[in-house]
Every structure is written in structure tokens, then in C-alpha cells.
Amino acid sequence: MLFAQAGASGSSQLLINARVYSPSHPAATAMAVTGDVISWIGEDDLGRAEFPDAEIVDLEGAFVAPAFVDAHVHVTALGLSLIGLDLSDVTAREQCLDRLAAYAREHPNEVIWGHGWDESRWPDGRPLTTTELDTAASGRAVYLARIDVHSAAASTALRQQVPGLAEAAGFHPEWPLIGAAHHLLRAHARGAFSAAGRAQARRAALDAAASLGIVSVHECGGPEIGGLEDFRELLATEHGVQVTGYWGEPARDPDHAGELVAATGAAGLAGDLFVDGALGSRTAWLREPYHDAPHTCGSRHLDAETVEAHLDSCTRAGITAGFHVIGDAAVTQVIDALGRVAERHGVPAVARCGHRLEHLEMVSAAQAGQLGRLGVIASVQPAFDALWGGPDGMYADRLGADRGTQLNPLALLASQGVPLAFGSDAPVTPMNPWVTVRAAAHHRTPSSSVSVRAAFGAATRGGWRAQGVHDGVTGTLTPGALASYAIWETGDLTINTSQPGVQRWSTDPRSRVPALPDLSDGAAALPTCLRTVHRGKVIHG
């Protein structure tokens, strides 16, 4: 098929011979775009008659659907993993160290920045040590972030460059660093990259997003993640993929909240404002000790007073607030604070801010109901469950089978009216939205699954809603909506079954429920993106 630029201002382009995913016309085979807006949806013959002067594009049976939004990413860090040392696919310590040694030989004059190792996938389950890195990299400065980016292994040469590292909480001379020690180390290693190097990484990440049918990403930045300089540079980057930034720094009062937003350019003071860490690094804050480390309940990064002050300040200022919460103790601390703020200022004042919680892996039914009543958005990553869920996964190792199989309860959240926005947390998990949708529909705890249709909505409309777009059409293919869509090569489409207790609809083709690609366990390859368009402009393909 031949593609041209989408319709210029005042002219129209008519896509025909397609399979169009539209709630307004489930059997549609054609879509007209005029400028940056979808102007019509229907069938081929009617489209030709309605738009006789339009440029015709024959899609030869391709699938046209709303473009995706990734509601939680770290753009520069993702780019560094794409153009640098990616360890996310290694399955043994020896393989990891061999790859590090080869990279060190090929890149002799730079700090080595790597990402993605996960010792829970290795035969002995032991993390990397300082001595092993020193040997493999021949004494070079090395920073290797664990897959969850809440701990990192580092060589002696890099450790010696960081003032005060040995005195920081979370330091160990041989094992990966966590907490304050890791934040010091990461900031120092990040400083070794030039502005040009950071720009190259960003472009690689945003290009990758566009190639996967993603037109908008939510950057979750903060002082302890990428730093203010990188955050501002990213928001100023010119690229077809839209970037909405959230800054993770606590506000003391409403004036301070406004000052932080003005200073950073952020859409809200949310995202990765850490209340705790991650389960893989045993830094998520739990009510009960870890099953495989009974001496610890993880780490708390913010106390209750700071959490409540932040929520109160942002609510009074009308600014979106949010936190990174994974462990049940962290989740409880934030939800309790939300309740007190709602009592003080009223539920409508809280709900209109669109506060959001990232990850939200351990949440009870009562807590989910409270979040639904307060209009709090759950920005979640279904691929976490695909990677680490189930009775034999890392979650079960860390928490035991009972607790470990109750994480990421997507169906519970949806049933309680909690708006879902799906993301990848890239580079933690792959930035492939069809992987995300499939993971949500095939949860390793089946009762926590949502339907493919609901998952697709959370990966498209859900992301727009989470960033404050409430027009009712953005994220859909409906006349009058912005022309943000992707064209996919895929096999048969199916009407997926609903999830009892969440949504119900008929799977009869006569019911006019729009069909989606087959994402069942036995399905063929995932859809391949042929073209991505945002606001009428082609950004990929």
C-alpha cells in the first residue's frame, strides 16, 4: 500500500478497504480525515460519494485503531537502554558479565551505563557484586540498574567518584545499592552524559514509541530519577510524540505547589514521587515482612505528614498530585491521607484534580472503593504481572504464594469505578502497548483480568483521561475527534468476551460491538504498526 501525508488543512484524505475500530460505526471500512480531525466514518462507497475530491488511500484490509498513550515512561532512561547496554534479556549471571565485558571493549572511553538485569530470572538468584563488575569491565566506571531501577550494581571506580556514598543509607561495599545511596550514585552516573548524548537517547525513545503506535507518553520525572535539567530538555524536545510531564517532588503548601509547576513545566506534581521502592529490590514498603527476607518490611521514603501536606497543597491549588506506591503499607498511607484531605475540602475538590497513583500493586477492595469515590486514577503496568506474577513468579518468591498472587488486581479496580490508565514504566518493561493489553487480559491470576476491550480502552482513552482530557471523544475514532490513530497489519479480528462483574456485552457479530485483534494465548504474532498519525500528521511510517 502507498501512504501519503494525512490530509492538509482544508483538504481530506479518505482511507478505504480498512477495518476501522470505531464505537460509532463498528462495521466501518473507511475513514475520512480533514486537517487534524476525523471528519467521517463509514463504508467505502459512501465515503467516495461523500468525499469525491479526497485523496484515496487503499489500506488493503489493514486495521485502523486509536493510537496508544503510554501513561508511565522514563524517556531518556529508555533511550539510553536502546542505544546502550541493555541487559533485560539475559538469563544468567555469566551471560550478563560477558555482555558487560564485550561492551566495555567496544566503548573504551565512557562511563558504562546499563539497565535491565534481573537476578530473579537467574539460576542462583544472586545479584551482581562490585568485584564481578570490576573484573568484567577491567576496572572501568560501571553503573548497572536493576530492572526495577530501585537498586543498581556499581564498580569500585564509579563508587569512588561519589562523595559521601559510603555514609548514605542503603550502601553496601559489594551488593547493589538501594535508597539514598542509589540515588546519589545514579545522579553522578547520569551527569557523565553530555546534552548531545541525552538528546540522542530521547530521540531514540520517542522514535521507538511512534513505531509502536504511541502518540503520547507521560514522563514521570523527579529530582531522584532524571533530574530537572533532563526533564526540562525533554519537555522542550520537538517530536511528533506528545510528552506530558509529571514531576515527583512534594509540595509544602499551595503556593509551593504552584512554584514547582511553574519551575518545571510539569502538568502535575505526581508520577514517581516515591513513597516506597520495588518488590524485586525488596524496597517496597509492606505491612508484613518479606517472605524471602523476614528481617525487613522494605523502605518508606515519605512519612504520613509529608504525603498529606502534598495532597492537601495540590488539592487546594487545583493541581494533579500523585505518588509511586507499590507495597500495601505505602498504599494505605496514601489512601488514608486522601481520605483526610477529602474530609477537609470535600470529595468534589479532590476528584476534580485527577490525582493519580502509579503502580498501585497491593490494594484491598475497600481501598479500591475509596479510590473510585474520590476519582483517583490508577496508572498501572499490566506487564509487571506478566513478568513476575503467578504462583511461581518473583512476586510469590518475595511475598509467598498467598500475597504474591493478589497483586495488580485490575478487575477489582475497574469494578469499583477506578479509572485505569495503562503504561509500561519503560525501560522497566517493554514499551509495546499490545503486550500491555494482552497482559491485562491474561492476568496470571485470572480473576484479576479485564477484557481485551477494557484493556484497549485503558491503553488509549485512559491515558488521555489521566492527563486531563475529558471531551469524551479523544482516544476514539469518532467524527469530530482529533485524528490520532495507528494503522496495523494483523490477522483476524474478534469480539472478545466481557469480564463478569466489570462489563457485559454480546459477542454476537450482530451486536455491533467493535472487534479487536486476537490476543489469545494461541494467537499468531502481535499486530505490526504500519503507520502512526497524531493530530493529522504522520509521525511514523
Predicted regions and their residues:
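Long hydrophobic segments that form regular secondary structure
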Residues: R300-R340, A466-V473, L477-E489
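Phosphate/diphosphate-binding loops
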Residues: E238-D272, G354-E361, A365, G393-V418
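Histidine/acidic-residue-rich catalytic or RNA/ligand-binding cores of hydrolases
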Residues: T156, G227-D230, V331-G339, W388-Y395, ...
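Short acidic/histidine-rich active-site segments
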Residues: I319-D328, V380-P382, L413-V435, G480
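Divalent metal-binding segments
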Residues: L2-F3, G10-D255, G280-A330, G354, ...
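Conserved, mostly hydrophobic/aromatic
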Residues: S155, G213, G277, H324, ...
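Glycine-enriched alpha-helix->loop->beta-strand junction motifs that scaffold or abut catalytic
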Residues: T264-A266, L371-S379, Q416-P419, H442
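C-terminal cap of metal-dependent C-N hydrolases
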Residues: Y21, R438, T445-P446, S451-R461, ...
